[in-house]
């Protein structure tokens, strides 16, 4: 579009600005990044106004990372507070329409980059702000007036961040007393399909969106004001399994929106047909087979989990709209759900959390488990995690003994099977050679133990070993 120094089109959704082509980075894992939309009286809004508090684009150094906050104020006859998070989630859409400007994540995890090519065409964030507001008012006509303030001053960004977190907390609390069984419809969201084409985000009262920005009420408000938009109704259909959270309606939409890639999504399962994971998720869960437990790591944690992998690596192999057994992306508020991974043990299966995340969701953790869940201060690897869980008598420890007994039983069964093998009748014309007995005090015999193995043998030759002279 001629009035802006960069092209604007949905074709730029999914465009990545790589580090080598980046002019500046805004927010992200190395700094603070925030976006917030607030409903306001029409008289309090100066339409299309862009305010910049802190260094503007022309004042920034190439290759540097800066703190970043975007506060949008919207007004209109139909605008109400219930629409704030709905409009807020479309920020991701419309910023990515702008060529050379990459936007990832949401709320207090925003990560943006401006390319060198785009920065060469504009020296201020003002045209960028005006372009985004133009897109909002074009696509969402219930917004009659809009203004935006960009913050790049660290102190100001921190101040806005604290205020915003309280607002987000109040929004999320609205679904506390509403549950999956209380409603007839869930809501779907396809905003992340530009980056994760097969992702099917299902929002229910007991399961917030993976990005953490859309709860059930937000989905309802969005579908009402923008029926053709990215949020829409999903008829629940028949309940197939109350524990896993499997519904016929969800399975149908999963198959349709993933182009047949998946035919089942179980809302509250970690292992069996789990919810797909996009890339905007706030937290990723990972199975730790050595302790039969599940750990969780969020974007803010910069260290390694006990499995020796960091968030970014796990996110890379979990995201993309896939169902990866052993990994699961979620929104932070799902920790507060009474149905939190209930098909696989719920909180009794959680063994590790980063200390800051554990502190953040303290109210969600059952009182009897708070001191039994390790953090990086208690366990940095599998061995130290196992020792911690044993010392605290975590619920997963009880499963270890059962697993060992099962292994012993399997070994005994295998020994019996091997011992019985020579008694089988050989095929006609075949002479089974005599097996040499071991000398000395040994009782002789053969023990073969196969665990989790599938073996196909075309031919087996048993011959006497001749001593070398």
UniProtKB/Swiss-Prot annotation:
Gene source species: Methanosarcina mazei (strain ATCC BAA-159 / DSM 3647 / Goe1 / Go1 / JCM 11833 / OCM 88)
The protein's role, per its UniProt record: Part of a complex that catalyzes the reversible cleavage of acetyl-CoA, allowing growth on acetate as sole source of carbon and energy. The alpha-epsilon complex generates CO from CO(2), while the beta subunit (this protein) combines the CO with CoA and a methyl group to form acetyl-CoA. The methyl group, which is incorporated into acetyl-CoA, is transferred to the beta subunit by a corrinoid iron-sulfur protein (the gamma-delta complex).
Cofactor(s) needed by this chain: [Ni-Fe-S] cluster
Gene it is expressed from: cdhC1
GO BP field: acetyl-CoA metabolic process; methanogenesis, from acetate
InterPro entries associated with the record: ACS_CODH_B_C, CO_DH/Ac-CoA_synth_bsu, CO_DH/Ac-CoA_synth_bsu_3_sf, CO_DH/Ac-CoA_synth_bsu_arc, Prismane-like_sf
Enzyme kind, highest EC tier: transferase
Protein name: Acetyl-CoA decarbonylase/synthase complex subunit beta 1
Record family assignment: Belongs to the CdhC family.
Reaction(s) catalysed by this chain's protein: Co(I)-[corrinoid Fe-S protein] + acetyl-CoA + H(+) = methyl-Co(III)-[corrinoid Fe-S protein] + CO + CoA
